[in-house]
Amino acid sequence: MEQVDLVIRNGTIIDPKNEINGAICDVAVKNSKIHSVGKGLLVTAVKETDAAGCLVTPGLIDNHVHCYEYATPLGINPDRDCLARGVTTAVDCGSAGASTFMGLRKYIVEKSKTRVLCLLHIASHGLAAAGCAGGCPGGESDTLAFLDSDACKGCIENNRDVIKGVKIRLQKSVCAKGATEDEAYRRALAVSEACAVPLMVHHIESSVPTQRPDGADTRIGCPSHLRAGDFYTHAYHGYDETIINSTNGKVHDDVISARKRGVLFDVGHGMGSFNWKVAEISAKQGFWPDIISSDLHTQNIHGPVYDLLTVMTKFLHLGMPLYEVIKSTTITPARALGMDTEIGSLTAGCDADITIIKQEACDIQLEDSVTQLRNVKQRLVPVHVFRAGVQHSILPKVLWPNEDILQHLAFQLERCVIKDDV
């Protein structure tokens, strides 16, 4: 029998790229790559792990985190807060801009066991200290001089192994009370198009409309001006410019059109950007996320986000099929990042990034970003994680909800136009 480095036996495999949904199989790893997947593999292994009763999936991909630790107020430690909670690939979304990216590369990307990728902020300083990131008034796009398109393009071209797209925040509070939003958005669109990479847009309480007025085809909108492969993050927030028409309770027409065009709707839960009510309305209309992501950062790791699997748990509670939940955190983001030949599946030859998950019963009140609670009856928790075939420790699971965080979040409910009592 052939010898391999690792074999994971008897797991329930969910691998959407290969259309495997619940088969009891073994997974073999050799030389840091997936060697084979099948029933009763005839191999001997240096290390053997029994995954009976557990889900075995490709290594989870968190498509939206902030992990520029110490250099930005939001920066988490990716190995502690992502890898140790079952995530093998984390995408830092906009913490760094062209002027600050090399620090992210040298001190985070190159030193982390977690695979860290990047969406480069259109603002040269990224989220070094701006608006909600730094606790000071104003934001990173208040001054258009900071949005150096040429510098952004040059940084992307020189670092394509790490930089997979562009990021912009469209919110009046970080764009000179809305005065610079249109131009900032146009620059971000132009840079991403010139570099042939996707654009991720944070779109909350913005002067750029979600739904353009009838006949206003020339008015720039979001997501109306996004293209196939672009990311619309924070898709389920309940503030002004939510995806829901507050008059008729339907998902906006421009949002539906964007999905048909190939725009990817990303959860980006965050400290303030996931609303149970918005998600429930969307779910009833079949508007599920393409990608489930956490927007994990220093202000939400102890609630209301906790980790990616907790966000996945919320969509399982909403009725999203488990297979689709796994797909939205594996092959869909891998394809969107142009990395589906390396990560996102258990295909032979791909990097041996593997997450083993327990789906367990619970009876817990789980909060959204604005203090609304739902009674969750099942949860997903990480059991084992392997990055390039190497096993890493899992941190203990956390308790929900965090009452201190609930008190801190209370003010955000007042800003919502969609909420439980409206």
Functional labels for PLM-detected ranges:
Residues 103, 147-265, 273-290:
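Histidine/acidic residue-rich metal-binding segments in metalloenzymes
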Residues 1-57:
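Histidine-rich, glycine-flanked metal-binding segment
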Residues 66-68, 95-96, 121-125, 139, ...:
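Active-site beta-loop-alpha junctions enriched in small/polar residues
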Residues 351-403:
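C-terminal cap of metal-dependent C-N hydrolases
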Residues 73, 85-91, 95-96, 111-144, ...:
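Metal-cofactor-binding active-site regions of metalloenzymes
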Residues 277-360:
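His/Asp/Glu-enriched, well-ordered alpha-helical/loop segment
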Residues 11, 27, 32, 53, ...:
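Divalent metal-coordination and catalytic microenvironments
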Residues 42-43, 51-111:
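Metal-associated gating/positioning segment near the N- to mid-region
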